[in-house]
């Protein structure tokens, strides 16, 4: 028995909630992996004998990786599918984070942090594509906003976990701090097992039978390809074509806005603790005094997006 209800208008179901957790877990790990360096750097610099130049480069390495990872993730998710790329990020988190435990030089740490950044960059287009293509249209905004909230939650947990590890982890605690992301990355990989491919992507590749099977699995046996909204014919456009098709100014606005927003926030998470300790040198202060920064950011994001 079929119906005429579009999958865009169905109620939020268990699969949608689980998919939000799966994609939101990526944002949580992103916030954790990008912020943990802020507290670990307190011990990393003297242990590896880093200069101010290498401190800054290592702190910025993940941000550089995100730039490249975003392009890579966007291109590969259209070519290879959402599901394949959905597991690349967690895999890189685990491998690169574990490798940081044995790091012996600033150059190697830079490379590993860069690859962690690439993993974060891949996460953004893949996770959002999954949510947009599966969620009902009335629930997309709130669920996508949840990703931002979870990013700040991950950043706050990074400060708490990092402080705990540094206090009780012994002389090489900074290595455990950097490697701790592997635990969350492994959990994220496990949680994402069983995620189906996007039926919209399958349709774009002419794999209609697979797409219909997934639609029935997610929405119920009474749903099929006819319940998907009509998709515009896909065209392969170059970056230059995109810029000259009326989207150039919009892209510039978004790019400039996010650059001016992200870089200062990233700098705060990477250097706030170190600057705080230098400013309070010789005075009474605790390393976790700056913790309200990520916690307040999390609260502010939650309040604005609720």
Locate each region found by the language model.
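Transmembrane-helix signature of 12-pass secondary carriers
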Residues: 1-306
């Amino acid at each position: 028995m079929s119906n005429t209800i579009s999958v865009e208008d169905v109620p939020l179901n268990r699969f949608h909630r689980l998919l939000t957790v799966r994609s939101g877990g990526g944002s949580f790990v992103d916030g954790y992996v990008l912020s943990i360096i802020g507290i670990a750097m307190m011990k990393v610099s003297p242990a590896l004998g880093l200069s101010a130049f290498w401190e800054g480069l290592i702190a910025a390495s993940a941000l550089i990786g995100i730039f490249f990872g975003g392009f890579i993730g966007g291109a590969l998710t259209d070519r290879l599918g959402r599901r394949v790329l959905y597991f690349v990020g967690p895999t890189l988190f685990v491998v690169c984070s574990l490798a940081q435990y044995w790091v012996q030089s600033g150059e190697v740490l830079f490379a590993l942090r860069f690859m962690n950044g690439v993993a974060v960059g891949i996460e953004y287009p893949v996770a959002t594509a999954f949510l947009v293509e599966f969620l009902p249209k009335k629930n997309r905004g709130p669920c996508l906003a949840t990703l931002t909230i979870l990013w700040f939650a991950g950043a706050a947990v990074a400060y708490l976990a990092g402080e705990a590890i540094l206090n009780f982890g012994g002389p090489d605690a900074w290595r455990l701090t950097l490697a701790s992301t592997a635990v969350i990355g492994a959990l994220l990989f496990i949680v994402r097992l069983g995620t189906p491919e996007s039926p919209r992507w399958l349709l774009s590749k002419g794999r209609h039978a697979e797409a219909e099977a997934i639609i029935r699995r997610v929405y119920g046996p009474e749903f099929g390809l006819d319940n998907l909204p009509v998709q515009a014919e896909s065209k392969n456009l170059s970056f230059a074509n995109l810029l000259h098709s009326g989207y150039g100014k919009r892209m510039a606005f978004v790019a400039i806005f996010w650059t001016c927003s992200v870089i200062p926030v990233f700098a705060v998470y990477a250097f706030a603790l170190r600057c705080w300790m230098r400013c309070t040198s010789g005075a009474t202060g605790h390393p976790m005094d700056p913790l309200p920064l990520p916690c307040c950011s999390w609260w502010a994001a939650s309040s604005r997006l609720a």
